Amino acid sequence: MSVLESIIDGVREDLAVRESTIPFDEIKQRSAAAPPPRDVMAALHAPGVGVIAEVKRRSPSKGELADIAEPAELAADYAAAGARVISVLTEQRRFGGSLADFDAVRAKVSAPLLRKDFIVSPYQVHEARAHGADMVLLIVAALEQVALEALLDRVESLGMTALVEVHTAEEADRALEAGAKVIGINARNLHTLEVDRDVFGRIAPGLPVEVLKVAESGVRGPSDLMAYAGSGADAVLVGEGLVTSDNPRTAVTQLVTAGSHPACPRPSR
C-alpha cells in the first residue's frame, strides 16, 4: 500500500464518523447557508507571482514540523505579509490538521481560504463550503476520472475554486480533461514522498496559457520562487518552508517581495 492509499483509508474512516454525526442533507443545508465564497481567481490573477501560505503542523515525510498553538494568529501573519490565499490542512492523522483549525482561521482572516485535504466524497466538498472554504484541493492521483470530474463540478457549482493537483503529465492531461482552471503541480510524489523540483518545469509548459499554474512543494525561499516563475508558475504554495522558519511572517514577506520584483519572470497569462 502506498503512502497516498494509506492516507485515504484513514480519511474515509474519519469521514464516516463525521457523516454519522452530521448527515449529508444537513451538511448540504449548511453549505447553502454559508456566506458567499471569495473570488480566488481574482486573487491569483493579481500582478506577479502569488503566494499561497499554508498552516501545516506535520507531514508524512518529516513528521512534526511546528507546534502551532494559534493557527489563526499564524494565518493573520501570513495575510498581513501579503499571502493571496491561506491554505489550512484539515487532515488529522498524518498532518495534524482539523476543521477546528480551519474555523479559527476563517474567523480571523478575510483572505480566501483553501481547504487542504484528501477529498474523495461530495460530503467533504459541502463540508468545506459550510466551514467557509473558498478553494478546495482535488488530487488527481487519489481519484478515478469520473469522480474527479464529478467533484470538480460540485466544487464549482458551490461557487468555489478547485486546485487540481498533479504530479505527472498523464495526470495533467486528466486534470485538463476534467476542466481544471487551476492546476497545482506537486514536486512531491504522494506515493513515495520523494521530491523532484524539476517536475514543474516538465509539465507546466504543456498546459494552456489560460490555466493558472501553481508550484507545490520544494519552495524554501525567494530563489525557489524565482526558479518556478521562470518555468511558468503563476503562484507557489508553501507550507513547510514557512512553519519551520524563524519568522513565518518575514518568510512570506520575502516570497511576496520576490514574486513582485521586476527581475521575477512574469506569468504568461
UniProtKB/Swiss-Prot annotation:
Keywords: Amino-acid biosynthesis, Aromatic amino acid biosynthesis, Decarboxylase, Lyase, Tryptophan biosynthesis. Pathway: Amino-acid biosynthesis; L-tryptophan biosynthesis; L-tryptophan from chorismate: step 4/5. PROSITE patterns: IGPS (PS00614). Disulfide bonds: none annotated. Gene3D superfamilies: Aldolase class I. Transmembrane segments: none annotated. One of its GO terms (biological process) is L-tryptophan biosynthetic process. GO terms for molecular function: indole-3-glycerol-phosphate synthase activity; phosphoribosylanthranilate isomerase activity. It is an enzyme of class 4 (lyase). It comes from the Bacteria. SUPFAM superfamilies: Ribulose-phoshate binding barrel. Belongs to the TrpC family. HAMAP family: IGPS_B. This is Indole-3-glycerol phosphate synthase.
